Amino acid sequence: MLSAGLGLLMLVAVVEFLIGLIGNGVLVVWSFREWMRKFNWSSYNLIILGLAGCRFLLQWLIILDLSLFPLFQSSRWLRYLSIFWVLVSQASLWFATFLSVFYCKKITTFDRPAYLWLKQRAYNLSLWCLLGYFIINLLLTVQIGLMFYHPPQGNSSIRYPFESWQYLYAFRLNSGSYLPLMVFLVSSGMLIVSLYTHHKKMKVHSAGRRDVRAKAHITALKSLGCFLFLHLVYIMASPFSITSKTYPPDLTSVFIWETLMAAYPSLHSLILIMGIPRVKQTCQKILWKTVCARRCWGP
């Protein structure tokens, strides 16, 4: 029998999964629809498509882990699932970093030569960083795959894969998150400085007038700030999720930490939708029609 607490956690996990599934699905469909309408990929559409696609995968990986972990705790394929999970998580972080670079390039207004040089080469530098990340992670993944086929001898972790050495390699693979996170923080910091500088100029020259650029700054910072908070929750919950799977596993702790982790791909999709007026209006219309249809049909 499931306890009341575990049942509640399972309900929250299902709700988060549905929110993430619908939210990221809407963003993927919108990106494709924009491409079909214009027959031209914009940088923003590509970033949103990649970000939503990675979040969609991440949501499925979390729900698969929660569903199958109690049944296949000692299965070898769950080890590879954990490695794939890390790679998808890092890809999601890279696309969020590209989004912060996009906001920084489009919104910030500095006139310093170093900034103008960096602004012109922002996408190229980001793509080179992504290529370097891909090569390093490919080498680490091959090394980890070989270790899974030749595990340390005389260790009980062969029987219980979540006990010790495998996740040391998963943590090593996860160290690739530092570079995109640093780029993300630098881009967000430049947005904050740009907003502060712009606010000072507006106070002097155009007090009382509608400030569209300041609104764009604030909207971008809200989205990036929420992402940073949710990503930090995700990072802090990950080690506890791993340690709760050590033998004997604590199923309640696994659900607590992975439910916190699932908030990252599900809730940020809603924040992105709220920041895209056309998608927001479409979702509001669909929701309103659903409510009206339910009222017409009755209970």
UniProtKB/Swiss-Prot annotation:
InterPro entries: TAS2R
Topological domain spans for side Extracellular: 1, 67-82, 149-175, 245-253
Gene Ontology MF: a single term: G protein-coupled receptor activity
Sugar attachment sites: N155
Membrane-side (Cytoplasmic) residue stretches: 23-45, 104-127, 197-223, 275-299
Membrane topology summary: Multi-pass membrane protein
Cystine pairings recorded for this chain: none
Transmembrane segments: 2-22, 46-66, 83-103, 128-148, 176-196, 224-244, 254-274
KW Cytoplasm (keyword) present: no
Keywords: G-protein coupled receptor, Glycoprotein, Membrane, Receptor, Sensory transduction, Taste, Transducer, Transmembrane, Transmembrane helix
Any single biological process term in GO: detection of chemical stimulus involved in sensory perception of bitter taste
Coiled-coil regions, chain positions: none
GO cellular component, one term: membrane
Cellular location(s): Membrane
Location, primary (coarse class): membrane
Anything else known: Most taste cells may be activated by a limited number of bitter compounds; individual taste cells can discriminate among bitter stimuli.
Stated role: Receptor that may play a role in the perception of bitterness and is gustducin-linked. May play a role in sensing the chemical composition of the gastrointestinal content. The activity of this receptor may stimulate alpha gustducin, mediate PLC-beta-2 activation and lead to the gating of TRPM5.
Family of the protein in this entry: Belongs to the G-protein coupled receptor T2R family.
Protein name: Taste receptor type 2 member 5
